[in-house]
């Protein structure tokens, strides 16, 4: 199997933008947030167990998950959050496992916001890449992008591991605090490094 990089970072750190930059260089990306969206859209595999666990009030008329209502619930009710995670996390993990052997690029990237928090993912990856930025920037970016309140962003951050812990676990770090060009330079530098590692990995 190809060399696999686990890409992670806190909310608002720029994981998606970094992953898109690697994709533009020809690298295949498995995005667990995207998988979660697929699982919770109309007729997705997670809809039936979510309906059973939480009721019809969390399912929209089109059959997809009401993400806003669910977000409000899980960040005010830890038991509900654990119940949702017990449904989603195994499904996301199994889908990731199925996609990994299909990667055809010289190396692959798995984007996992909770890479360090959820058991199992670290054993799937060969290196951990952390996208990092100061916490005030995480908050302001997320509020601008997602229309969440500052408290809602902080609630998300509270269930993610700390910035210090992420950085301590990182094999590689991209500092995303200075605009697109700064990010792109770091991506291209790591891309060259990963290509060399991938060739050794395949020997």
Swiss-Prot record:
Pathway: Cofactor biosynthesis; coenzyme A biosynthesis; CoA from (R)-pantothenate: step 5/5. GO terms for biological process: coenzyme A biosynthetic process. CDD domains: DPCK. One of its GO terms (molecular function) is ATP binding. It comes from the Bacteria. It catalyses: 3'-dephospho-CoA + ATP = ADP + CoA + H(+). Pfam families: CoaE. Residues 4-201 form the DPCK domain. This is Dephospho-CoA kinase. It comes from Nitrosomonas europaea (strain ATCC 19718 / CIP 103999 / KCTC 2705 / NBRC 14298). The gene is coaE.
């Amino acid at each position: 199997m190809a060399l696999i990089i686990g890409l992670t970072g806190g909310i608002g750190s720029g994981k998606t933008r970094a992953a898109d930059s690697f994709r533009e260089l020809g690298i295949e990306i498995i995005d667990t947030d995207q998988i979660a969206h697929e699982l919770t859209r109309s007729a997705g595999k997670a809809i039936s167990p979510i309906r059973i666990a939480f009721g019809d009030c969390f399912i929209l008329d089109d059959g997809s998950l009401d993400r806003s209502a669910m977000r409000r619930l899980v960040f005010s009710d830890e038991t509900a959050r654990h119940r949702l995670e017990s449904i989603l996390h195994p499904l996301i993990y199994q889908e990731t496992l199925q996609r990994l052997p299909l990667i055809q690029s010289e190396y692959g990237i798995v984007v996992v916001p909770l890479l360090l928090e959820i058991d199992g993912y670290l054993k799937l990856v060969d290196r951990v890449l952390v996208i990092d930025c100061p916490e005030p920037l995480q908050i302001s970016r997320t509020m601008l992008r997602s229309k969440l309140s500052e408290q809602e962003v902080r609630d998300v951050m509270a269930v993610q591991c700390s910035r210090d812990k992420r950085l301590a676990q990182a094999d590689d770090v991209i500092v995303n605090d200075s605009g697109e060009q700064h990010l792109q330079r770091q991506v291209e530098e790591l891309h060259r490094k990963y290509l060399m590692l991938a060739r050794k990995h395949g020997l």
